[in-house]
């Protein structure tokens, strides 16, 4: 059968209503919906949706728990291979964010009739490349026809029940590490609008296609204490950090000068190149975040920017910060110490 083609669609991002993890439901909407659901969590279920963590964890035996996550989204870039790679890396990130090891994955595909099938083949090949890099097989999947292409994975992992790293254990006296620069949401919006420089597109692509495996393995190594761990994705640094502080009943201070940013992103934000999801993120957290007086709104947007396969955010006891930093550096992870955890009403203070 001949492939169906179109001369009208030249770019994958033309078919997406928003890019990557910015396509998530607004945090406020999700909270409203989940708030009406009763948790059926039993004694074997170690992590559910009550703390908005990155994956579900279910104990199978005294020394083994299964970790399950699912993640998919519309195109963030026009190259189908790179789109597949980004989506797969993003799905795998949730496993690493739980201190777990991935075992296998299933593909999730939504694909329009009018695109050539070779596009889908390239998307799947991109996903396979990241599964290969993670050392896991893809054992199957599910596909449906959809006017908007989407791709992602359901990933299954494993961890010792006593070594699960959740987003709920941060303690006053901890310091906060971030393993990737912020700004991929704004960068992909610039790509979608055709206003991104080649340098920005290359840098953002490098961030989004880099697995969080190395950082995840360091945090799970047991070489130093990790009180809480999550990945920074669709709700931005502020949103995911606020989830961490809410669970810990503590308050975070962020040092603006230490937070790594993708070059060109602040200028783009100042020009209004900001995804709707990022603006929703800022609106959701604004009442619980204190910014320095006069801080431009464009910088606030960057801190709330919806990330696609963003870095890991870890809460580590201050006395072990140097040990953690050295271990991350040895693994080739360019981590930044961006703030600290203090006693206080759940929220975030941005300083600097």
Swiss-Prot record:
One of the GO biological process terms: selenocysteine biosynthetic process
Give the residues annotated as active site.
21
User: What SUPFAM superfamilies does this protein's entry cite?
Assistant: PurM C-terminal domain-like (SSF56042), PurM N-terminal domain-like (SSF55326)
Please state the Enzyme Commission number of this protein: 2.7.9.3
Q: Which GO terms describe its cellular component?
A: cytoplasm
Q: Which GO terms describe its molecular function?
A: ATP binding; magnesium ion binding; selenide, water dikinase activity
Cofactor requirements of the protein: Mg(2+)
What's a Pfam family in this record?
AIRS_C
Q: Name the reaction it catalyses.
A: hydrogenselenide + ATP + H2O = selenophosphate + AMP + phosphate + 2 H(+)
Is-annotated flag, keyword Membrane? no
Which positions are annotated as binding Mg(2+)? 54, 94, 231
* InterPro entries, per database record: PurM-like_C_dom, PurM-like_C_sf, PurM-like_N, PurM-like_N_sf, SelD_I, SPS/SelD
Give residue numbers for the site Important for catalytic activity.
24
Q: What does this protein do?
A: Synthesizes selenophosphate from selenide and ATP.
What protein family is recorded? Answer: Belongs to the selenophosphate synthase 1 family. Class I subfamily.
What is this protein's record name?
Selenide, water dikinase
Upper lineage is:
Bacteria, Pseudomonadati, Myxococcota, Myxococcia, Myxococcales
């Amino acid at each position: 059968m001949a492939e169906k083609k179109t001369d009208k669609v030249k770019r994958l991002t033309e078919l997406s209503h928003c890019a990557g993890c910015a396509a998530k439901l607004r945090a406020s909407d999700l909270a409203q919906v989940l708030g009406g659901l009763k948790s059926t969590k039993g004694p074997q279920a170690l992590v559910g949706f009550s703390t908005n963590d990155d994956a579900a964890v279910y104990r199978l035996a005294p020394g083994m728990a299964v970790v399950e996550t699912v993640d998919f989204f519309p195109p963030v870039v026009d190259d189908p291979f790179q789109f597949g790679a980004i989506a797969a890396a993003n799905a795998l990130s949730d496993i690493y964010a739980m201190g777990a090891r991935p075992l296998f994955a299933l593909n999730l595909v939504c694909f329009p009739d009018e695109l050539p099938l070779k596009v889908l083949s390239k998307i799947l090949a991109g996903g396979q490349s990241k599964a290969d890099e993670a050392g896991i097989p893809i054992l199957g999947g599910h596909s449906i026809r959809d006017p908007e292409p989407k791709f992602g994975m359901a990933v299954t992992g494993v961890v010792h029940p006593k070594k699960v790293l959740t987003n709920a254990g941060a303690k006053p006296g901890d310091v906060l590490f971030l393993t990737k620069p912020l700004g991929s949401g704004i960068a992909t919006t610039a790509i979608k609008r055709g206003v991104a420089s080649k340098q920005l597109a290359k840098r953002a692509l490098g961030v989004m296609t880099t697995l969080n495996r190395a950082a995840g393995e360091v945090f799970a190594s047991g070489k130093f204490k990790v009180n809480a761990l999550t990945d920074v994705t669709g709700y931005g640094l502020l949103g995911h950090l606020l989830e961490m502080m809410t669970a810990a009943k503590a308050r975070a201070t962020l040092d603006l000068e230490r937070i790594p940013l993708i070059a060109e992103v602040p200028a783009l934000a100042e020009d209004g190149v900001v995804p709707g999801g990022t603006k929703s993120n800022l609106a959701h957290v604004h009442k619980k975040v204190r910014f320095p007086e006069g801080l431009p709104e464009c910088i606030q947007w960057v801190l709330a920017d919806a990330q696609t396969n963003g870095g890991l955010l870890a809460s580590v006891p201050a006395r072990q910060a140097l040990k953690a930093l050295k271990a991350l550096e040895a693994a080739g992870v360019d981590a930044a110490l961006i703030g600290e955890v203090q006693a206080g009403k759940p929220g975030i203070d941005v300083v600097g």
